[in-house]
């Protein structure tokens, strides 16, 4: 039976000094016999998805203490991708994931904590904490801040979100008054942006991995029901500690819950709900922390057999996360996947002995439990606020229509092929990814002329200056993990292509990545990246490029001899942008770039290189 990790600093004569310091934090004699639960909060006033989290750590802490544990809260950083976007701030977004993972490891290991509650929400915070949890492999529960309500305005018949504001702002035909109205209406409350963007995608995937409570990904930040998730997280983590430290039950450890099959479940859900392509990057990174052999080839295999059962903004204007919740949330999607034979249901979770038990209890089409039905009727109030749990509005009915509703059955899927795909070819030997959920079927096969840009900034200038024409394939390179550095999101270029009326007439390929708000024929994560000698660095203006989603291929239409000749020429020049880029690459960013791998490896640190540098 394992000892509490915390005994290292709470027991024995030699730890008198440490105990003295623990006492200064409020601990008493009886507390040294209890598990110390680290509460990793990510409150910040910079990010709407985190602005309401200030008191959440203490809410969990009090419940931990009532359940018999000792709670100690600390904070991590949190970057808002939307605010950091469109300038050099975006260089810091993906590297912040590693900083978050490291900071959780540092705090938990330095103080010998026995377990963790991860209070996350937005784009890099949930992945960073997930990486840390799998690295540490001690009991953990994830609880997020919850999604934002969709925006409302008389100028639109559908709910609004951040992307709507960006697209309308770039539309030269839109009046200043209309732009201002969209801006004021798009993000009305606290919470992660209201569509199936990266933050909400990742919070949904923690449910599929078995590390979060049902409703974690879909219950609105503003709704009073969400408070119960925080309270239950406090009780659950103490129970997990009891099972592991007192009952010798290793099945509750995160690597045993989030095993290979659980990663398949998470990716299956991601494909079925048309999640952000960033989730692929983050799942690959988390799998490496868990020492699981899960890669793009596994994702490619799943993408060919999993149908799309849910469609949410930005892939469709009609639905946002509040509608997913009304339709039964993530466990109703998992239930449909299970009935289709597409899910591993024999796996443990933090709340149920098996995923099958969890589905039986929480899928609204399988349970008659009125409390569950009431929970999923929680809806938006339509009142701008930055306060959590501030409203108790409920829908009059659930959306249990599996033929035409927000969530569909396998038989009535939006499409029989899912919302994400992996493409391979001579331009991306190690793969690249596309969110097919946001691509019109008429352009699933697209051949066009390459239009080269060697930075996101120059691409934005070119698109706004009408240098990009119908039939072009915009290539934005040297924006990968090393080349950026930091693998910027390309939401502005894709949004501006839409605003120029080119959303269905152009494609975009990059070794950078995309916001979860991106739609259209936008292909990212090209691996190897240009800075690592990837063939995307060999494309020239006017080259023909063929994209074939049905056959999962993407190719530069030149022969092998020409490709080899170009590679030899580029080797002499060096793999760097031709044009000078006025961006300040600090020591912190250089350190990230030194060790960063390409996107097919999750853009994590190159551990083999690190082992050579520090044997």
UniProtKB/Swiss-Prot annotation:
Keywords: 2Fe-2S, Amino-acid biosynthesis, Branched-chain amino acid biosynthesis, Iron, Iron-sulfur, Lyase, Magnesium, Metal-binding. Pfam families: ILV_EDD_C, ILVD_EDD_N. [2Fe-2S] cluster binds at residues 122, 193. Coiled coil: none annotated. One of its GO terms (molecular function) is magnesium ion binding. Pathway: Amino-acid biosynthesis; L-isoleucine biosynthesis; L-isoleucine from 2-oxobutanoate: step 3/4; Amino-acid biosynthesis; L-valine biosynthesis; L-valine from pyruvate: step 3/4. It is an enzyme of class 4 (lyase). The keyword Iron applies. It comes from the Bacteria. The modification N6-carboxylysine is found at residue 124. It catalyses: (2R)-2,3-dihydroxy-3-methylbutanoate = 3-methyl-2-oxobutanoate + H2O; (2R,3R)-2,3-dihydroxy-3-methylpentanoate = (S)-3-methyl-2-oxopentanoate + H2O. Binds 1 [2Fe-2S] cluster per subunit. This cluster acts as a Lewis acid cofactor. Its EC number is 4.2.1.9. The active site is at 515 (proton acceptor). Its cofactor is [2Fe-2S] cluster; Mg(2+). Mg(2+) binds at residues 81, 123-124, 489. NCBIfam families: ilvD, PRK12448.1. Belongs to the IlvD/Edd family. This is Dihydroxy-acid dehydratase.
């Amino acid at each position: 039976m394992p000892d509490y990790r915390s005994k290292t600093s709470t027991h024995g004569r030699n730890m008198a000094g440490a105990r003295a310091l623990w006492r200064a934090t409020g601990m008493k004699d009886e507390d040294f016999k209890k598990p110390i639960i680290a509460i990793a909060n990510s409150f910040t006033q910079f990010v709407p998805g985190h602005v309401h989290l200030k008191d959440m750590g203490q809410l969990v802490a009090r419940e931990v203490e009532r359940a018999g544990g000792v709670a100690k809260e600390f904070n991590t950083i949190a970057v808002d991708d939307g605010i950091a976007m469109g300038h050099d701030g975006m260089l810091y977004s993906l590297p912040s994931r590693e900083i978050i993972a490291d900071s959780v490891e540092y705090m938990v290991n330095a103080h010998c904590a026995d377990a963790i509650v991860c209070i996350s929400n937005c784009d890099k915070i949930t992945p960073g904490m997930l990486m840390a949890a799998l690295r540490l492999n001690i009991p953990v529960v994830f609880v997020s801040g919850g999604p934002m309500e969709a925006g409302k305005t008389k100028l639109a018949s559908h709910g609004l979100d951040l992307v709507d504001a960006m697209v309308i702002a770039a539309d030269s035909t839109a009046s200043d008054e209309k732009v201002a109205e969209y801006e004021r209406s798009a993000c009305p409350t606290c919470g992660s942006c209201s569509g199936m963007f990266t933050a909400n995608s990742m919070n949904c995937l923690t449910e599929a991995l078995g590390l979060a409570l049902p409703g974690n990904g879909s219950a609105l930040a503003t709704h009073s029901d969400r408070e119960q998730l925080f309270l239950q997280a406090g009780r659950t983590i103490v129970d997990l500690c009891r099972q592991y430290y007192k009952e010798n039950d290793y099945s509750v450890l995160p690597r045993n819950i989030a095993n290979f099959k659980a990663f398949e479940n998470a990716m299956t859900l991601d494909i079925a709900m048309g999640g952000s392509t960033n989730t692929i990057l983050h799942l690959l990174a988390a799998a490496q922390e868990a020492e699981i052999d899960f890669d793009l080839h596994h994702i490619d295999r799943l993408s060919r057999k999993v149908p799309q059962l849910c469609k949410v903004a930005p892939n469709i204007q009609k639905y946002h996360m509040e509608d997913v919740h009304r339709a039964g949330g993530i466990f109703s999607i998992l239930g449909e996947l299970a009935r289709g034979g597409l899910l591993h249901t024999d796996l443990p979770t933090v709340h149920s002995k098996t995923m099958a038990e969890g589905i039986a209890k929480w899928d609204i089409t399988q349970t008659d439990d009125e409390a569950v039905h009431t929970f999923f009727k929680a809806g938006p109030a339509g009142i701008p606020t930055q306060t959590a749990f501030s409203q108790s509005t409920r829908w009059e009915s659930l959306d249990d229509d599996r033929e035409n509703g927000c969530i569909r059955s396998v038989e009535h899927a939006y499409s029989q092929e899912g919302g994400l795909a992996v493409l391979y070819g001579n331009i991306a030997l190690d793969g690249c990814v596309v969110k097919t959920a946001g691509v019109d079927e008429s352009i699933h096969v697209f051949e066009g002329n390459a239009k080269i840009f060697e930075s996101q900034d120059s691409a934005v200038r070119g698109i706004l200056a009408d240098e990009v024409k119908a039939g072009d394939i915009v290539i934005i390179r040297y924006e990968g993990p090393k080349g950026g550095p930091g693998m910027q999101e390309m939401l502005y270029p894709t949004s501006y292509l839409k605003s120029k009326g080119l959303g269905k007439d152009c494609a975009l390929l990059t070794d950078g990545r995309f916001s979860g708000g991106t739609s259209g024929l936008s292909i990212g994560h090209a691996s190897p990246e240009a800075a690592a000698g990837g063939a995307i660095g060999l494309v020239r203006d006017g080259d023909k490029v063929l994209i074939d989603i049905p056959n999962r291929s993407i190719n530069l239409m030149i022969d092998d001899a020409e490709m080899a000749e170009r590679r030899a020429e580029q080797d002499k020049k060096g793999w760097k942008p031709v044009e000078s880029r006025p961006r300040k690459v600090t020591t912190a960013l250089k350190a990230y770039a030194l060790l960063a791998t390409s996107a097919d490896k999750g853009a994590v640190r190159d551990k083999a290189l690190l082992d050579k540098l520090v044997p």
